[in-house]
From Swiss-Prot:
Gene3D superfamilies given in the database record: 3.30.2320.80
Swiss-Prot/TrEMBL keywords: Metal-binding, Nickel, Zinc
Family: Belongs to the HypA/HybF family.
Species of origin: Campylobacter jejuni subsp. jejuni serotype O:2 (strain ATCC 700819 / NCTC 11168)
The keyword Nucleotidyltransferase is annotated on this UniProt entry: no
GO biological process: protein maturation; protein modification process
InterPro entries in alphabetical order: Hydgase_Ni_incorp_HypA/HybF_CS, HypA/HybF
Residues that span the membrane, as ranges: none
Annotated binding of Ni(2+), by residue: 2
Binding site for Zn(2+): 74, 77, 90, 93
Protein name: Hydrogenase maturation factor HypA
The protein's role, per its UniProt record: Involved in the maturation of [NiFe] hydrogenases. Required for nickel insertion into the metal center of the hydrogenase.
Length: 114
């Protein structure tokens, strides 16, 4: 259940951004969660609703989540592909030599503050 610590860090980051921008209220938080991030989205939402109550700045914030697909760059044929299933090879040339471009992380994309 690492979602607890991730949500706690997210709220701290939002509070820090608000203070740095002389805002007193975060209204909307937009995040992008990668398919391979290991984050359970429903649990993440529940943790957010619980933890935001302890924050004066984020207490009324709404959370918006975008799911990022798993995107790879094949190091053999230079093809960029989105993998729909957990088959870790290039769909074009079948190579297993690739670099993950997106889909492993959580990113804070945007804050709406007042």
């Amino acid at each position: 259940m690492h979602e607890l610590s991730i949500v706690e860090s997210l709220i701290e980051l939002c509070e820090e951004n608000a203070l740095n921008n002389k805002a007193y209220n975060v209204q909307e938080i937009y995040v992008k969660i990668g398919r391979l991030s290991g984050i359970e989205v429903d649990l993440f939402k529940r943790c957010f609703e619980t933890f935001k109550e302890n924050s004066n700045i984020c207490k009324n914030a709404k959370l918006f989540i975008e799911l990022a697909p798993l995107e790879i760059l094949c190091l053999k044929c230079d093809q960029t592909s989105i993998l729909e299933e957990n088959v870790f090879k290039c769909p074009k040339c079948q190579s297993i030599e690739y670099k993950i471009i997106q889909g492993e992380d959580l990113h804070l994309m945007r804050l709406v503050m007042k």
